[in-house]
């Protein structure tokens, strides 16, 4: 991307988005893990413009702090300016220009905050065309099979751009035109300022339309150019939730395809969803029904899925994660997780470790080679290397007031159904008997067993639950046991 360096970008994000039927501002609705506005600002920041401006209006008090956070993460300044009244896109651009230095004299790119697939390369091509043609304005256009709702591009007989007419103001014949305004422009700032001062609200919406600038500059004898793109999805806008879902699916298709081209096997792209900030290593296999969300990072040669959702999870090389729901966790190299495993935030599983069926973990570190095979809750615990936690074990971490930690050493073997009542420490190499309740520390190498000998209360069910199916079954079994077997020498 090479173009003239004196460039400012103005992103319009002041609209109310009433067709979304939502309390959330339109530009904050998300696709592939980012809000629409975040997609736009990430793309424009890649151009490294001198100035990046966002024009806000509706719900600006909710959007502005998020813009500040994004600016910090991108490591650049993003200026925010307000459009106090919804007077149209022309007025919004005028508000955006007010955030630029008074002596700025370069190119102004105008785009919208609700075109989430627009990329930096497309805008760079627009700027290159604009500079090469020495135009006052260059507009990005595309052709749609159904152009309803878009402004139509009017051209002269020699194919020069003459004007843009909005859907509501177009004549029946103009509405048949399929080349549309993509809502992305490159302007020379002096030409733009001059045309903005002459905009009129004499139209169906009684607003100041930015596209009317094209006709004004044309009448001034200025050069008006267009850059047509075939990939119309890049400039598709979102006005309702149907369009949000459609563009979300298209963006996901592109993300999945990019991973496939980079060496990832995706068995069923139609049921696989990958956020834009997720990363996947080579020769990893993604099974159907998998969602990789947020900043999830998958290593090389992993097996992920089926039916797995990972949000902000790091997975090391050669790991297997099957039918698992995890968030804000780390899975070590060559580890095995699943099926039906729930990793809550703060889980760290070491290299070669195992979390098996119906295991839930939270805020815990499980060491290298340690196995928690099934039916276990591990919360607020630190488990050393090469230990084994028996089936049905529970880390009892909550005393009704505070969460307490348990520390389990390396090479520990806990029997099935062990209860670790935190805070408690179990030393290296210790064992616990099945069903043991660990309330006190266990020294290294010790066997911990709780509870006395088993005591059977005879006939308790018949006495305490008479008439129940259990009591009847017990009565029959007792009767059969009390009947002597027949004498083989004297059959009945």
UniProtKB/Swiss-Prot annotation:
Catalytic activity: alpha-D-glucosamine 1-phosphate + acetyl-CoA = N-acetyl-alpha-D-glucosamine 1-phosphate + CoA + H(+); N-acetyl-alpha-D-glucosamine 1-phosphate + UTP + H(+) = UDP-N-acetyl-alpha-D-glucosamine + diphosphate
Binding of acetyl-CoA, residues: 391, 397-398, 434
The enzyme's E.C. designation: 2.7.7.23, 2.3.1.157
Residue sites binding UDP-N-acetyl-alpha-D-glucosamine per the record: 12-15, 26, 83, 88-89, 151, 166, 181, 239, 344, 362, 377, 388
Entry-linked Gene3D superfamilies: Hexapeptide repeat proteins, Spore Coat Polysaccharide Biosynthesis Protein SpsA, Chain A
Cofactor(s) of this protein: Mg(2+)
Record InterPro entries: Bifunctional_GlmU, GlmU-like, GlmU_C_LbH, Hexapep, MobA-like_NTP_Trfase, Nucleotide-diphossugar_trans, Trimer_LpxA-like_sf
UniProt protein name: Bifunctional protein GlmU
GO cellular component term of the entry, any: cytoplasm
Gene Ontology process terms (BP): cell morphogenesis; cell wall organization; lipid A biosynthetic process; peptidoglycan biosynthetic process; regulation of cell shape; UDP-N-acetylglucosamine biosynthetic process
Root EC class: transferase
Cofactor note: Binds 1 Mg(2+) ion per subunit.
Binding partners and assembly: Homotrimer.
Cellular compartments annotated: Cytoplasm
Region (Pyrophosphorylase): 1-241
Annotated organism of origin: Mycobacterium ulcerans (strain Agy99)
UniProt-annotated stretches for the region Disordered: 443-492
Matches recorded under Pfam families: Hexapep, NTP_transf_3
Binding site for Mg(2+): 114, 239
Active site: 374
Pathway: Nucleotide-sugar biosynthesis; UDP-N-acetyl-alpha-D-glucosamine biosynthesis; N-acetyl-alpha-D-glucosamine 1-phosphate from alpha-D-glucosamine 6-phosphate (route II): step 2/2; Nucleotide-sugar biosynthesis; UDP-N-acetyl-alpha-D-glucosamine biosynthesis; UDP-N-acetyl-alpha-D-glucosamine from N-acetyl-alpha-D-glucosamine 1-phosphate: step 1/1; Bacterial outer membrane biogenesis; LPS lipid A biosynthesis
Highest classification ranks of the organism: Bacteria, Bacillati, Actinomycetota, Actinomycetes, Mycobacteriales
């Amino acid at each position: 991307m090479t173009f003239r360096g004196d460039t400012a970008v103005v992103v319009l994000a002041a609209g109310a988005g009433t067709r979304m039927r939502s309390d959330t501002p339109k530009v904050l609705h998300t696709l592939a893990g980012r809000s629409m506005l975040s997609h736009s600002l990430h793309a424009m920041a890649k151009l490294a413009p001198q100035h990046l401006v966002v024009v806000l209006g509706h719900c600006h008090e909710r959007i502005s702090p998020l813009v500040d956070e994004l600016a910090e993460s991108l490591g650049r300044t993003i200026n925010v300016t307000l459009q106090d009244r919804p007077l149209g896109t022309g007025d919004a651009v005028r508000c955006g220009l007010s955030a630029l230095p008074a002596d700025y004299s370069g190119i102004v790119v105008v785009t919208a905050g609700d075109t989430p697939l627009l990329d930096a390369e497309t805008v760079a091509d627009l700027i290159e065309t604009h500079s090469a043609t020495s135009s006052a304005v260059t507009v990005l256009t595309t052709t749609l099979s159904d152009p309803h709702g878009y402004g139509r591009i009017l051209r002269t007989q020699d194919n020069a751009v003459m004007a843009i007419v909005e859907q509501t103001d177009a004549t029946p014949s103009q509405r048949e035109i399929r080349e549309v305004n993509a809502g992305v422009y490159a302007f020379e700032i002096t030409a733009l300022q001059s045309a903005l001062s002459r905009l009129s609200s004499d139209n169906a919406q009684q607003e100041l339309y930015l596209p009317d600038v094209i006709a004004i500059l044309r009448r001034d004898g200025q050069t008006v150019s267009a850059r047509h793109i075939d990939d119309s999805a890049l400039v598709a806008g979102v006005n309702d939730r149907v369009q949000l879902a459609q563009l979300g699916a298209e963006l996901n298709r592109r993300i999945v395809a990019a991973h496939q081209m980079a060496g990832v096997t995706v068995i069923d792209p139609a049921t696989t969803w990958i956020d834009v900030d997720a990363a996947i290593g080579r020769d990893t296999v993604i099974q159907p029904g998998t969602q990789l969300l947020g900043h999830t990072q998958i290593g090389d040669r992993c097996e992920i899925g089926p039916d797995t959702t990972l949000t902000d999870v790091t997975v090391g090389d050669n790991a297997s994660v099957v039918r698992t729901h995890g968030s804000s966790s780390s899975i070590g190299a060559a580890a095995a997780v699943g099926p039906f495993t729930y990793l809550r935030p703060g889980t760290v599983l070491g290299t070669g470790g195992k979390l098996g069926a119906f295991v839930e973990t939270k805020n815990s570190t499980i060491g290298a080679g340690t196995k928690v095979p099934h039916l276990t809750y591990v919360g607020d615990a630190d488990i050393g290397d090469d230990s084994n936690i028996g089936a049905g074990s529970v880390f009892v971490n909550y005393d009704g007031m505070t969460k307490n930690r348990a520390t389990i050493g390396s090479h520990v073997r806990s029997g099935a159904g062990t209860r670790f009542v935190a805070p408690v420490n179990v030393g290296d190499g210790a064992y616990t008997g099945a069903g043991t309740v660990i309330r006190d520390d266990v020294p290294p190498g010790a066997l911990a067993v709780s509870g006395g000998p088993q005591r059977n209360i005879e006939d308790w069910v018949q006495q305490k639950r008479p008439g129940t199916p259990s009591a009847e079954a017990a009565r029959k079994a007792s009767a059969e046991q009390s009947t002597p077997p027949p004498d083989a020498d004297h059959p009945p």
